[in-house]
């Protein structure tokens, strides 16, 4: 059984009915903030939770540059609270949604798990510091089983089209923003810089389908059975796509041009981020 905890800061309870449409069941849902340690602990006890997948947190690079305090307070604070609740309930299996933003902007792609870590934006720094805290847990409690999943750039939706990324307000990620421009909900796509040292001048990212990302979580959970310690994996495809290439692909599929403009570079963006996913495939 799965139980969901979410404060609905950037999500909707409508997702629950969509899950029921697809699976035939509705998972138990508790509206709560992870920083409410007592409530989280109560949920763990009530549902006899044995493992946790920690997806919660703010997740936009640009927003983190504009409001770093919010990112540190929420992302790190919620994780520390979660750890406390898990320890109280004697739950020691955790899958953490980390990010490729932990890697150094000067490192060369593709990134291996051992690639130098040096985040250049507050969002990436919160992920890096959380990884460090989780790794420290192993030193004080040998029973912990931790998976650090470094996402590259997730996109896509469930094959039924009934579950996808629906942001509250203006999307912070490229693909949902692009689709809202395509559907007329937003007037124009801003591309942050076309003067990077890439073939077309725009940033290059490794885009992974959300369904493949979900499979990665289940595989990580299976891997941790019978194993202790902290284990990190890159979740990406190993292939890079530029912003313009993604836009042009969408235009080809929908059959009409996307209204777009080139603006100045955005602080906190790296030129290229491509995964070396060989460790994830091997394990």
Residue ranges and their predicted role:
Residues 1-157:
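N-terminal Rossmann-like NAD(P)+-binding domain of SDR-like oxidoreductases, especially those catalyzing
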Residues 15, 36, 170, 174, ...:
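Alpha-helical structural motif
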Residues 24, 66, 74, 141-143, ...:
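A generic fold-level signal
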Residues 32, 44, 71, 166, ...:
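Pocket-edge positions in alpha/beta enzyme catalytic cores
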Residues 34, 61, 76, 172, ...:
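Short alpha-helix boundary/capping motifs
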Residues 72, 120-128, 164-176, 206-207, ...:
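Short-chain dehydrogenase/reductase
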Residues 160-161:
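Catalytic core of nucleotidyl cyclases, primarily class III adenylyl/guanylyl cyclases
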Residues 175-283:
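C-terminal substrate-binding subdomain of Rossmann-fold SDR/epimerase-dehydratase oxidoreductases
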């Amino acid at each position: 059984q799965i139980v969901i905890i979410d404060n609905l800061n950037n999500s909707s309870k409508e997702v629950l009915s969509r899950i029921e449409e697809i699976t035939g069941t509705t998972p138990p849902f508790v509206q709560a903030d992870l920083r409410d340690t007592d409530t989280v602990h109560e949920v763990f006890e009530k549902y006899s939770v044995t493992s946790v997948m920690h997806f919660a947190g703010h997740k936009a690079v640009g927003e983190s540059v504009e409001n770093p305090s919010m990112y540190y307070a929420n992302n790190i604070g919620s994780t520390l609270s979660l750890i406390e609740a898990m320890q109280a309930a004697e739950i020691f299996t955790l899958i953490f949604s980390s990010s490729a933003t932990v890697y150094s902007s000067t490192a060369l792609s593709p990134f291996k798990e051992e690639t130098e870590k040096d985040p250049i934006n507050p969002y990436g720094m919160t992920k890096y510091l959380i990884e460090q805290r989780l790794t420290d847990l192993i030193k004080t409690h040998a029973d912990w089983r931790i998976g650090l999943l470094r996402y590259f750039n997730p996109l896509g939706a469930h094959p039924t089209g009934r579950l996808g990324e629906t942001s509250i307000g203006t999307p912070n990620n490229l693909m949902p923003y692009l689709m809202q421009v395509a559907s007329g909900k937003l007037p124009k796509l801003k591309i942050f810089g076309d003067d990077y040292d890439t073939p077309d001048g725009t940033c290059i990212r490794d885009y992974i389908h959300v369904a493949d990302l979900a499979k990665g979580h289940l595989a990580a959970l299976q891997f941790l059975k019978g194993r202790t310690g902290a284990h990190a994996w890159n979740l990406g495809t190993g292939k890079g796509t530029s912003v313009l290439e993604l836009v042009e692909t969408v235009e080809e599929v929908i059959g009409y041009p996307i209204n777009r403009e080139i603006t100045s570079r955005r602080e906190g963006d790296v030129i290229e981020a491509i995964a070396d996913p060989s460790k994830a495939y091997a394990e």
